Structures are given as C-alpha cells and as structure tokens.
C-alpha cells in the first residue's frame, strides 16, 4: 500500500479479503473514510463508475458508487487518509470501467481525473460541487478484492502491470484459537504508541514510504530479472518484464521496513510471483517449456526453464516455484494454464 499502486487481494470466497481491508483502515484510524464499492457485472465503461455529464439538463450526474463524492472529499481533506475498495473487482472487465484510473494511477505527481470537458463547467449548475477535474492526492489508497471462478473475468496485462496481486492462503483452522488474544491487541497498542498519533495522518503515512533514488535491486538481481525476461520473450512476445515492473519491484523492496518478518529474499520472491508469474497463462505449446512437466506420481516438476533460472540464483524462491508448479499442474490436467 505504501508504494501507492493498486493492490489486489485474491483468494477463495470467504477467506477474509474484505475483512483485511477493514482492519487496515481501522489500524490507520480511517474507518470513516473507507468506501466499499460493490462492482456490478453490468459495468461496461467508466460512466458506470464515475457518472456522466447530462448536457440536456446542464448537470453532472455522479455514479451510484459514491466514488466521485469520496474523491472530492479526499481532495478537500488532504490531511486524512481515504481508502477506496472495489469489492469483487473482476465481476466486470476492469480495463473497461477502470480505464481512466489505470492511466491516472501510473502518473507520479500530477494525478488528475477528468469527469467531463472543462468547457462545460460554466454551463453546469452543479459544477462547484462536481468540477470537471479532480486531483487524486497522496492521501488516497486503492485496493480491490478478487475472486477467481466461472463468474469473473481474468485481468489483462494492462491491469496486472500496474498492480500488486496478493494471493491469500487459508491458515490451519486450529490457528483461529490464537486470533483476538490479548497479546495481539497489546501489540497494536504498542505500534500506535511508537507512531505517536492516532488516527494516522496522510503526512505521517506518506513519511513511511522510502522514495530514495538509489536502487534496492542489486546488479545480480537485475541480471536475474533480465534472464527471466529473455526466457519469457522466447516463449511468446506477449510475455516479459517491462521497465515499469522492474521499477515497481524496486520500490516494493525499498519499502520493506527494517526488522520486518519479510526479508529482501522474501520480497523478490513475492514480487516475481505477484508481478511476473500472474501474467503467465496460455496453451501447452506456449507454456510447456516455461513451467515444465508435472509428474503426478512424484508431485514434482521437471524441465522448467523458469525454475532453472531461479535455481541459478542465491535465493530460494519458494513461492515463485510453488506458483510455477501449480501452472504446470494446470497444464497437465487441462492443456492450458490460467
């Protein structure tokens, strides 16, 4: 979230994706500024989300989602954090209804969302309430929850290039006994005391981010990413690792807090799984050399060029290899990987 990219939480229905967003907002003291938007399967373009200019009646009509009102409120309240969560984000095609946001979120500084032509502003009766442009400030965080089943759409590369996909796993049910115990509550209180303020302001939250120009990725890390890119490109020209993704991976690594349970090795592993492997899907002819052959008897994968490249590194890449293994298994069972 600190990297200001779109964060997508993926996992089984009922695993707690929406709850995590609620708890994150609670931890920041931003519960009242959390807007849950339920995505409709009928959405086809950004007017369903944002609204549209009614030139017949000379007014701007915002969408029923309440997104525009939240963005305007956040723009006029830069001191406080606002979180916008798109629930079941892939019930409709994200690149259709979210197209303008995908472009705006990629801008580093001047993030401007256009609602309508500025020439119409003097004509609209409610232009003071709904101006033609809204500035997306550093106090707004975007997150989406995702279910992967027959009722949803796959994300396009355009979406995946601009987001972090975090796949949630189910903990053993016996661990539920530990949740909510006093030690966890006390730990949260201690963190709040260390920060020294509550609710946490946007300025304080942004100060957590590390925006140093010096790269966290080492030369050997970059060489590994380049080798993976070449292998992907050889399989298909639509696969690969763009410069944008490399920069985002570097920014992610720079923002791992000191003393965190996640190490740099874990971070690179997570980022390859979240930013690179999520885009790999296709038929056997394209995918076989990349993910290898899955053996049902031994439950292992052989002949994977991607695993071969990862094995040449000093890192373990546990998550990435597990994801490649899953895709090899899908390929073996279905003739394609998703």
Indicate where each model-derived feature is located:
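C-terminal regulatory/interaction module of P-loop NTP-utilizing enzymes
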Residues: 1-338
